[in-house]
Amino acid sequence: MRIAIIGGHLTPALAVLEHLPKGMDAVYIGRKFALEGDTAYSLEYQAMHDRRIPFFHLTTGRLQRTFTPQTIPSLLKLPRGFWQAFRMLQTIKPDVILGFGGYVSVPVGIVGKMLGIPLIIHEQTLETGFANQILAPFADKICVSWKSSQKFFPANKAVLTGNPAVASLFEKSKPHRLTKGVLPRLVIVGGSLGSHAINALIEGCLEDLLKQYEVLHQTGDSKEFRDFDRLAQKRDSLGPILRERYTLTKFIDPDDIVSVFESAELVVTRAGINTITTLLLLNKPALVIPLPTSQKNEQLKNAQFFKQHNLGEIFNQTIGTPEKLFTIIDAMIKQKNSYTNTHATEELTTHKHSVQKIIDTVIYVAKKTSQ
């Protein structure tokens, strides 16, 4: 059986890829480059290259909920995306398509259904992503991570599977090479691509942070902003004591993320649902900085969900300053004992078996279609 996996969200896709049983092989369709017009390879391309999984790069436009200056140029790319999807699927000849959200999944899912290929999609958010809303009428089954998502999809299609990304992160967690230092450790992550806004805020208060804390900072590798290079120069300009306290990295291996979070007194992060769920399961305090441009304010809702569990605070990057950021970080670390998950629920434990549930769904749909 051959599965075409569409990114989207990389971490849950990887979790399923790495647990496929014998007799199943997979290809991956996604973005080769991190940002449009950038030359840096995307994390999904690097991950597939490292695992020797065939990768197909698809160029298409984004379907947007609101009209922006990018709407028309983006729409003009859609026909190309559908044509590429048709050519790819004719070459790949998959038995099943498994989509993990994201705009790349739209043309592949629709064209695949037109070609008679069964489609399964996975929704990892608390509500529903725009791409999956579009694909839902075409999908044979819809795997959801949260009970709150079920009401957005037809009851005969929705299957509660949990989030495979989280289960995989804990399963593959390994001790990180960083040893515990004398000072409390602050871990700063900006998502798989990094965050220029977070990087700039941290840069503005870096020396104040390093006077009190060890800092592990994941910047991403954008060639447009070159944050890693600039911050590396700043690190080299610091005195030897502060320089030693600052660990700079472009990426954090997904296999390391649980142990990295465990080593932290506090995490500063975007509010992606995988990160939020992982932090909840670890009972780890965090200052979350929602991406203001996320669809349907998805990250803000994730951040509010996290704060309701009494594990963190929310920082607004559009009005926040480096000085304000430092003040909140400092206060949270000093009051860390006041942050603990007081609303632990059984729902969080459903993620543990999600990989197998999704694979079982894929096998069920493939067999049903072939009959």
Features from the language model and the residues they span:
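Conserved donor-nucleotide binding/catalytic region of nucleotide-linked donor-dependent transferases
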Residues: 313, 318-350, 368-370
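C-terminal alpha-helical cap of glycosyltransferases
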Residues: 350-371
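An amphipathic, basic-hydrophobic alpha-helix
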Residues: 60-96
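Conserved nucleotide-sugar phosphate-binding/catalytic loop shared by glycosyltransferases and other
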Residues: 5, 25-75, 316-318
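Acidic donor-binding loop of glycosyltransferase active sites
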Residues: 94-96, 261-275
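Donor-nucleotide binding loops and adjacent catalytic segments primarily
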Residues: 35-41, 174, 180-266, 300-303, ...
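Glycosyltransferases and closely related glycan-assembly transferases
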Residues: 84-98, 104-120, 133-137
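Active-site-proximal region of nucleotide-activated glycan assembly enzymes
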Residues: 25, 54, 113-174
